[in-house]
Amino acid sequence: MANSKFGYVRQFETHDVILPQCYIVVRIDGKKFHEFSKFYEFAKPNDENALKLMNACAKNLVLKYKNDIILAFGESDEYSFILKSSTTLFNRRKDKLATLFGSFFTSNYVALWAKFFPEKPLNIKHLPYFDSRCVAYPNLQTIKDYLSWRYVDTHINNLYNTTFWQLIIKCGLTPQESEKKLCGTFSNEKQEILFSECGINYNNEPEMFKKGSLVTRKGEILHINVIAQIDELFEGY
């Protein structure tokens, strides 16, 4: 950068750095994706192509930074990228990690859109974009708990959304009626409603919907019981 008498303004810039020895999670979330998915008529409760598009973007990001990323996990319109505690990527700067991961993911989403939605060209007034946050986690157990949290959240959200939408699609309920019917119900009760009233066995739903998607450093996309394999996933880290 050229020197000039105006260069003093750089003194006002701040660069937060993630503490050393901490694991780093960069989590990306679709911004206003409720409106976005409605405009492009995503299938409810899950749009398989939309999820596969998210997975493709995540895979490209993981492979780009495979020396720093342990794994990535995604559900719906979010993805979490877990970085090694020893990473020096972008000098561990919070702003760089959050903005570059977010922009890389967004650009891939736009570039790959036509592959997954060839009959739905992107509208300039309804473009996808993602927010991104960067969080430090102090030890291995905490990062395992983080991934377990996102995995459990996937199950809870998908079971609710599946039951909610099937009551509307198959049973003719209004959104308000479906919400009221599910209010206060537990997981086993939702599964019973799905089976007895909608004729759907939740256990037979696609693994990607129920378990989310995990991307390994090699770019493999898996749909597994994360909690059952949590120690194996972080072996050596």
Swiss-Prot record:
Residues that, per the record, bind GTP: K32, F33, H34, K44, D47
Keyword vocabulary terms for this entry: Acetylation, GTP-binding, Magnesium, Metal-binding, Nucleotide-binding, Nucleotidyltransferase, Transferase, tRNA processing
One GO cellular component assignment for this chain's record is: cytoplasm
Query: Where is the PTM N-acetylalanine found along the chain?
Result: A2
Q: Does the keyword Metal-binding apply?
A: yes
- GO-annotated molecular function: 3'-5' RNA polymerase activity; GTP binding; identical protein binding; magnesium ion binding; tRNA guanylyltransferase activity
Q: Which residues bind Mg(2+)?
A: D29, G30, D77
Q: What is the effect of changing D77A?
A: Significantly affects the G(-1) addition
Q: What is the effect of changing T185A?
A: Significantly affects the G(-1) addition
Note the subunit structure.
Homotetramer.
Q: What else is known?
A: Present with 1170 molecules/cell in log phase SD medium.
What is the protein named? tRNA(His) guanylyltransferase
The species this protein was found in: Saccharomyces cerevisiae (strain ATCC 204508 / S288c) (Baker's yeast)
